[in-house]
Amino acid sequence: MKGLILVGGYGTRLRPLTLTLPKPLVEFGNRPMILHQIEALAAAGVTDIVLAVNYRPEVMVSTLKKYEEEYGVSITFSVEEEPLGTAGPLKLAEEVLKKDDSPFFVLNSDVICDYPFKELADFHKAHGAAGTIVATKVDEPSKYGVIVHDRDTPNLIDRFVEKPVEFVGNRINAGLYILNPSVIDLIEMRPTSIEKETFPILVEQKQLYSFDLEGYWMDVGQPKDFLSGTCLYLTSLSKKHPEKLCKEKYVHGGNVLIDPTAKIHPSALIGPNVTIGPNVVVGEGARIQRSVLLANSQVKDHAWVKSTIVGWNSRIGKWARTEGVTVLGDDVEVKNEIYVNGAKVLPHKSISSNVEKESIIM
């Protein structure tokens, strides 16, 4: 089987982290985000994976090629000279995706969930139509494009309603698909949208079904959702692989994932919902909750860190406090006793005065 991951462009929503690394290589759960998807595809029997890239492809190649042998897959990089949207990349990768008659998976690189690839493939084969969209239920469907089903045929999609004013359903496109190779014939080689241009054709032909996703789902393309997605991921990990979570005495409230190379002072209080990466140092009496500490960062004595992404090589000083979805880029220093609330701090900056409201520090 085959799979295509829509890696996309600059990752502007996740800046300042993406000023240092392309978004799919930013660590989520202490592994590059895209590695969760590659692993899930490989586990479902996918042998050929295409990464549709238009930003810093050389970094992606050098980082991800080494995983081919580990996961037993062939990784091909389809490099767009101009951004081709969400459908154009399928046309660009036509040679790989149409090399046999088997269907192929398509997924957005921002999506984190319990990837149901095996079940999705079985469902797709059973109904026999050209395409299947994974659908997830949401609490506020008025913010999304909602899937409306045919009244007579279960799971057959009748139409999409964009940001409905009145309730028509609560299932939305989860950014995961399985498609027959024939779908590529509907796509032109130009910037084009699979959601707005290709799927409506399949709906009109009664060739598009939806498959309900069980469990958690999150598009982690921006900081607040990256943190929320981390909470969901850690909760899932606690149920499926509790042995991977930290059980030390300094863990408070559970759902804490710590790289074995990190050094945590015994008097620190960590959790709930914290990920700590390689070579991180957490000092005496520090308090960390609902946060992500990326590799080589430091939280010094008695600092208080909440709802914060601490970038690589960054340092939070003694008695400092960060909260309010603060994101520190690479090599940022927050000085001792400084308060930071909701700031996005670009790489290599030093914060020596309080930041009391949401702002970008350049």
From Swiss-Prot:
InterPro entries cross-referenced by the UniProt entry: GMPPB_C, GMPPB_N, Mannose-1P_guanyltransferase, NTP_transferase_dom, Nucleotide-diphossugar_trans
Gene3D superfamilies reported for this sequence: Hexapeptide repeat proteins (2.160.10.10), Spore Coat Polysaccharide Biosynthesis Protein SpsA, Chain A (3.90.550.10)
Subcellular location: Cytoplasm
Enzyme class: transferase
Statement: the UniProt record of this protein carries the keyword Cytoplasm: yes
Entry keyword Cytoplasm: yes
Effect seen on changing residue 333 to Q: In strain: 1161
Catalysed reaction, written as an equation: alpha-D-mannose 1-phosphate + GTP + H(+) = GDP-alpha-D-mannose + diphosphate
Pfam hit, one: NTP_transferase
GO biological process per UniProt: cell wall mannoprotein biosynthetic process; GDP-mannose biosynthetic process; protein glycosylation
Main location: cytoplasm
Keywords for this protein: Cell cycle, Cytoplasm, GTP-binding, Nucleotide-binding, Nucleotidyltransferase, Transferase
GO cellular component, one term: yeast-form cell wall
Protein family membership: Belongs to the transferase hexapeptide repeat family.
Functional summary from the UniProt entry: Involved in cell wall synthesis where it is required for glycosylation. Involved in cell cycle progression through cell-size checkpoint.
PANTHER family cross-referenced by the UniProt entry: SUGAR-1-PHOSPHATE GUANYL TRANSFERASE
Protein name stated in the entry: Mannose-1-phosphate guanyltransferase
Annotated source species: Candida albicans (strain SC5314 / ATCC MYA-2876) (Yeast)
Organism taxonomic ancestry: Eukaryota, Fungi, Dikarya, Ascomycota, Saccharomycotina
Gene that specifies this protein: MPG1
